[in-house]
Amino acid sequence: MTTTTRGPIPNGGGIMRRLNLGTALLCGFIFALVGWFIAGKLFGFGEGPENAWGRDRVWIITMTLWALGFMTGIGAFVGPVRWVMGKDQKFEDQMYLAGKNQGVARYFKFTTDHKVVGIQYLIVTMLLFFVGGVLAMLIRTDLISKNTEIFGPQTYNAVVGLHGIIMIVATIIMVTGPFGNFVVPIMIGARDMAFPRLNALSLWLIVSLVPILLSAIFLGGIPTGWSAYEPLGSQAPPGMDSYIMTIIIFAISSGVAGANIVTTVVKMRARGMTWNRTPIFVYGVVASVGLAIPAFPTFMASQVISGVDRTTGTVFYDTAAGGNDWLYTNLFWLMGHPEVYVILIPALAAMMEYLPVFVRKPLFNFNAAVIGIAGIVGLSVMVWAHHMYMTGWAPNLNAPFMLTTELISVPTGMLFLVFVGTLWRGKVWARLPMLAVYAMLWNFIIGGLTGIYLSDVPVDVALHGSMYVTAHFHYTLMGAGLVGAMGAVMYWFPKVTGRMFDEKLGGWGFWISQVGFNVTFMGMFAVGLAGQPRRVSAYSSLFEKGNIVSTMGAYTIFIGMLIFFAAIVRSWTSGEIATSNPWGAKTLEWQVPTPVPLENFEVLPIITSDPYGYGVPESKPEPVLESVDAGGHS
């Protein structure tokens, strides 16, 4: 797939030879079972309200030990323990840890090769999207008619909450996880990430949180919705403990991954790769993780405090006892709105990366693209309170936050103009990744324009909490973000898998899902404008036709995505063998062989031109390769 798999497996590895996903699951189960038993004896297994603190302590301890056991069983702590004991890692150990010559087995192990980690992220993301999509179908089925009720109100809210947080996790990692890991190190001329073990650690932390999150189904669910507002969170069943632990683990994973990516790009770029020669996708990934590094710890802090309230009787969020639930709302949205751009920026950057390839002309105003990305990052941390207009918190700040929210349309508009300017008079090569750009632009316009309206206090007062808001953020996160990720999959598929993507089958899936998407959320715009609220399953007959339309559209999305996933599997297993550079692209990942060697380059490259010089006579098609020491410059 990505590296040569023939030849003897290295003799090194030590205990790592016996650790894999199976041992991780076994150790996690044993640790969790022991923790549950001991914690139950200490704090009680009672289910009544009089034992709520003890019950939550039991589950949080159980989930914590599950995660520790899982990470122990996968081998995440072997390296640190060896370092503490003063044992150096041999070359054979390093090669084994990188997955050399281990075939498919390396995808089920703690493997440090950034290409393997990228593929692991891709598979995990697809599984999360499938689970989240199934939950979405259950939600829309419940809403198809005012007389249809497959859930009770509490279960409906729990399903909505679980769907929301699964999809948020999936969309956050859908581009930076697979392609930030697989592509970025090659794209900047590096042999691997700066911290390969931390790279693998970030991935397996994500895997460890999936069972914790899904356990909420059996613990009363997440009836608060994905935002888990207080005091609802403190009153929720033990499924809320699953939510708390999921967010804590995810924040740790995101911080580790973000620091690793930023360090890699800053310190390991190839000689000659100045910032003006650095591909725009690299900028997008760095901006995304750079925004996540300060944003997600605030989310983590909000959940730590919530966990303390649930397990020790503190009242940080209990207004009646002297706490303040606005504290939670501020901490949550300090993460919640930057998180939108953590998702959106790398998806748009991926499309800006390959757009010049398919129009055979340079990216229009590279500097404007960089400034637009930087502007979004800067303003995204100054708009969080537009989610709080209706809460009564600091009403004197409504106007300033309305202004900053409207201002963020300026840098996003700059990115839109970069797309349009690049398309202008280009010689379009109408392959499926290119056509996805048109779909994204349509969705991006709708998501952006509806967002401008919602930024105004009077409009927000009328539409806040309605299906209109649901449609708006789906047009942004799914219509632009997910479509960008699908385009990235189609574009880099030949390099990741060594095979061409089946554009016929994949095209059917893509366009069916796009038709369904617009039908679904146009219907939601309509019922939202008419007044249908979010977060409740019962509604007036006034909204029934719109919900029938939206549900039919949702089924269409699901069918289209299943076809698209089938195209991925079919192409991966039996697709046409790809050449090293089927698109005729100039960036470094397309200049190395397919499958990509373990260390990416036999000799490290020296960059002599920008990556978008299509149609420029003096622009060289390939970088100069010269044997130099590993490393780069800041």
Each predicted region: which residue ranges?
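Membrane-embedded and interfacial regions of multi-pass energy-transducing membrane proteins
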Residues: 2-634
